[in-house]
Amino acid sequence: MYSKSRKISRRDFLKISGIGLAGVFLGSAIAPWIKRIQQPTTNVTILREDSYQNNLEDSLRRGIAQYPNILKKIQGGRVVLKPNLVDHYPNRPLNTHPAMLAATIAAFRQLGAQEVIVAEGPGHNRDTEMIVEQSGVSQILKDERVRFVDLNLDDCTPIELVSRYTQLSRIFFPHTVLGSDLVVSMPKLKTHHWAGVTLSLKNLFGVIPGIKYGWPKNFLHWHGISQSIADIATTIAPGFAIVDGIVGMEGDGPLHGAGVDSNVVIMGDNLTAVDATAVRLMGFYPERIQHLLLMMPYGGTINEMRIKQIGESLASSQILFQPPPVVMTNINQAPSFWHKALVSGW
C-alpha cells in the first residue's frame, strides 16, 4: 500500500532549499578550484648557454625536437616568431637578442617549416622600424631573408575571447597571428614593475594591434594587465615558448633594470609551465604571479611536481634576481603551505 503524500512544512521547505542552495554555492565555489588543480603534466627544457656566440642553432633544434606535437605543426607549416622588442637603450638587455632570433629561424627551417615570419607590435615605442633597425634585428632579417610584420599595423579581425577575465567579449587579433600554424613566444628573461615578470605570456601583449588599442596598449591596461595577458593567451593559444635567458634583466624591469648573466634558454609547449619554471629560476614564486594563476583553469601548469625538467636541473640553474620595486605582490616571498595548496593543489 502506498503511503500518503505528506505536506512539506514551510520550515522543512526552507531547510531543504537552504541545503540545496548551499550545495549549489559550494559546488560553484569548488568547481574552479578543482579545475585549477587538475593541471596537466608537461615538459620544460632548460639549456645551459653562456654566450650568444655559441652554436645556439644546434642546441635549439635539439631542444625543439623533444616536442613531437610541435614538430607536426612545424613540418610544412607557417611559423610566426614573436620576439620581445621593446625599445633600444644601448647596453641594456631589453630585447630578445638578434643571435637568438637568427638561431631560432635556422632551427625551425631545419625542422621543416615552410615559412618563418618574425612579427612584433611594440607597445612602448611607436616607431617599430627604428627598434628593429637599432636592435640589430633588421640585419638578421636581411641575412636570413625573413619577412617582418609590424603587428601594430597588420590587418586584424575581432575574435571572441575564451576566458573573458577582462569582461571584454572580443579583442582584435592580427591576421599574421591568426593565419599561422604555430606561434612561438620568444621573450627576454626579465622582471616587470607591474606584472612581476615579463616572460612568454606577458610577451603576447605585443600581438595586440596598436592601431586599435593605442600605445602602450592602454585600453587593455585599463582592463587589468594580468587579466588581459590571460585573455590573449587563452584565445590565440600560442604553441611554444623559447625564453632568452642568456642575459636577463633584474630589478626595475622591463626597461630600467640591470643585466644578469643567467646563462639559460628555457623552452616548452605549455607557456604557463615555461614561465613558472623561469620564475623559480629567478628565485621568485609562481603562486605570487597573478596571470599564471589565471591560466590554470585553461590548461596552464605551475605545480612543480607536474613539470618534468629536461636538460639542466632547476636547482643548478637558479640565480636570485632582484625583484621589481613597484609590483603589487611580494613575488620573492615564499607562500604558505595552505596558499600553495589553495592555488596549485599541493
Question: What function would you assign to each model-found segment?
Answer:
Residues Y2-W346:
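N-terminal and secondary-structure boundary signal
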